[in-house]
């Protein structure tokens, strides 16, 4: 009799679960400003707002992928404050791992160009820097950081702790690349490879650059791949402004980045837009400040968010599910 009651209760509740409101979180690119996303996620978690799907570009892909593979906001903060992360985005090598016998003698030059007059005047491209940041440290960190998550999901991003997509750019064919399977580290690494700053990587014979070139706020990917009932968007970037004579990054942005639609129709969800006056691409040391900006804005909008999203998830249950998921890591 008891088993029958349990079965009946389950069958009665099943339609509610099947029809439960699904929530998608879309995170824009924006360099260090993307640290704001962590504060948003923390505020949503603390208020029992569900996050069922995540899409992100560039820094949004980094934060989104970490959460999707089972990192808590505390875990993300700890990682992004670590010395390992500083070496990742700066390209610096620890002193103990530097092998000076392989290094050329230091010179004051920024780049070295050699000219050949043998056949015709030409610049040998191997003497131009491929990126400002040496990619070796970043590549090693990405292997260590994402390898187990890739193995646990079998290369299927739908099987992460939270289903996830990120966007990279195919600059040859002038289109976005939606990353939904394969090596998670490669997908995120491609999504944040801003031209000149970071070296691109090759995925399936395609040279993949920062997703922000063609789609810095992938709401379309969220709609097409996951069909959520409501979308929460976090926008920490703007379309390129008029370039300045002495600002190389603004010049590059204007040359390569297409305009992005950072809006979400009211009927589809909520968008939080953040404006910054003095935060640069690499200001990662300001993580506490940027986290709090996201957290405080989300808390100020919580009544509005709760009025649109009626479903709740218990934070203790999320933590338990996270532990269970990560226990399957090889």
Positions of PLM-derived features:
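Sec-dependent N-terminal signal peptides
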Residues: 4-18
């Amino acid at each position: 009799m008891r088993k029958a009651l349990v079965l009946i209760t389950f069958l009665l509740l099943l339609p509610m679960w099947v029809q439960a409101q699904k929530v998608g979180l879309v995170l824009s690119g924006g360099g260090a400003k993307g640290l704001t996303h962590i504060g948003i996620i923390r505020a949503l978690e603390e208020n029992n707002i569900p996050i069922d799907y995540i899409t992100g570009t560039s820094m949004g892909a980094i934060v989104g992928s970490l959460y999707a593979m089972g990192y808590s906001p505390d875990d993300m903060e700890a990682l992004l404050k670590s010395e390992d992360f500083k070496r990742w985005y700066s390209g610096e090598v620890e002193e103990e791992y530097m092998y000076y016998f392989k290094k050329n003698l230091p010179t004051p030059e920024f780049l070295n160009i050699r000219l050949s007059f043998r056949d015709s005047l030409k610049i040998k491209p191997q003497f131009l820097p491929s990126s400002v940041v040496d990619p070796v440290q970043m590549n090693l960190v990405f292997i260590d950081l994402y390898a187990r998550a890739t193995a646990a999901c079998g290369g299927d991003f739908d099987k992460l702790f939270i289903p996830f997509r990120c966007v990279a750019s195919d600059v040859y064919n002038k289109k976005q690349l939606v990353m939904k399977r394969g090596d998670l580290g490669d997908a995120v690494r491609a999504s944040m490879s801003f031209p000149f700053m970071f070296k691109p990587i090759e995925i399936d014979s395609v040279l993949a650059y920062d997703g922000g070139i063609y789609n810095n706020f992938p709401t379309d990917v969220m709609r097409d791949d996951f069909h959520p009932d409501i979308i929460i968007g976090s926008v920490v970037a703007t379309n390129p402004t008029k370039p300045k004579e002495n600002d190389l990054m603004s010049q590059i942005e204007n040359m390569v980045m297409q305009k992005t639609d950072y809006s979400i129709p009211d009927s589809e969800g909520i968008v939080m837009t953040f404006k910054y006056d003095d935060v640069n691409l690499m200001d990662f040391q300001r993580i506490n400040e940027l986290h709090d900006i996201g957290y405080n804005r989300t808390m100020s909008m919580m009544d509005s968010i709760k009025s649109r999203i009626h479903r709740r998830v218990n934070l203790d249950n999320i933590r338990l599910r996270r532990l269970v998921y990560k226990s399957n890591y090889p």
